[in-house]
A protein has these predicted regions:
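Catalytic alpha/beta core domains of metabolic enzymes, predominantly
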Residues: 128-131, 142-211
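A general structural signal for stabilizing positions within well-ordered secondary structure
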Residues: 1, 95-96, 156, 199
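Active-site beta->alpha loop and helix N-cap motifs at the rims of alpha/beta catalytic domains
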Residues: 2-146
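Intrinsic-disorder/low-complexity regions
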Residues: 1-2, 166
Length: 211
């Protein structure tokens, strides 16, 4: 994905196959990527559906490398790099960028209660870990992070280089607010559910990550 372009179309959150023993199922992962590559417009990996938070950093790197290698030249891949620590998120983001990801995205830091400054510091660490201009998406999912990221903080992140937001608030009014206040500046507001697609499309949405 060109740094200036937005995500487009249907970008499903891909599951991560495991063996019965709990190990990564690499042949299954490769087969899944091969199947989806001709059916959708992009892939979102290692997110909630992809069991990202349940995997080690090394396992997540293996999933990213395998998916990116298999999808190369076919469809863009967005790698979810969210973690409880900014150190892990930065490491995973740098790795994904170096392996050919179209973008990275991360749910904000979780488990502990974070104030606005802590959330901003988390995403700044991600931005600092990737090449300048590389697409970094905020994954706004209050159900899992435990807090809302307010419009002021989102504007700061946009000003500092964040490429867009995956809005998983399931609140069409929140989506409309982001689209009105940030979408016209080039900030990519991506819908994080298929259930509101028609309304979001009318508001200017160009992509959704169903879930």
């Amino acid at each position: 994905m060109d740094n200036r372009k937005k995500l487009y179309g249907v970008v499903p959150p891909m599951i991560t196959p495991f063996t019965e023993g709990g190990e990564l199922d690499i042949p299954g992962l490769e087969a899944l990527v091969d199947y989806l590559a001709s059916e959708v417009d992009g892939l979102f990996i290692c997110g909630s559906y992809g069991s990202g938070p349940l995997m080690s950093v090394e396992e997540r790197k293996i999933v990213a490398e395998t998916t990116l290698r298999r999808a190369a030249g076919k469809i863009p891949v967005v790698v979810h790099t969210g973690a409880a620590s900014s150190r892990d998120a930065a490491e995973l983001s740098a790795h994904a960028a170096s392996r050919g990801a179209a973008a990275v995205s991360a749910v904000g830091p979780y488990y502990y209660h974070h104030n606005a400054d802590g959330v901003l510091a988390f995403y700044r660490a991600m931005l600092a870990a990737v090449p300048r201009g590389f697409p970094v998406y905020v994954y706004h999912n209050p159900r899992f992070s435990g807090y809302e990221i307010d419009l002021g903080a989102m504007k700061k992140l946009a000003d500092e280089g964040a490429r867009g937001v995956k809005d998983a608030t399931f609140d069409i009014m929140k989506f409309a607010l982001y689209q009105r206040e940030l979408g016209e500046t080039g900030f990519d507001v991506v819908l994080g559910t298929e259930s509101m697609w028609l309304s979001a499309r009318a508001l200017g949405a160009e992509a959704y990550i169903p879930g």
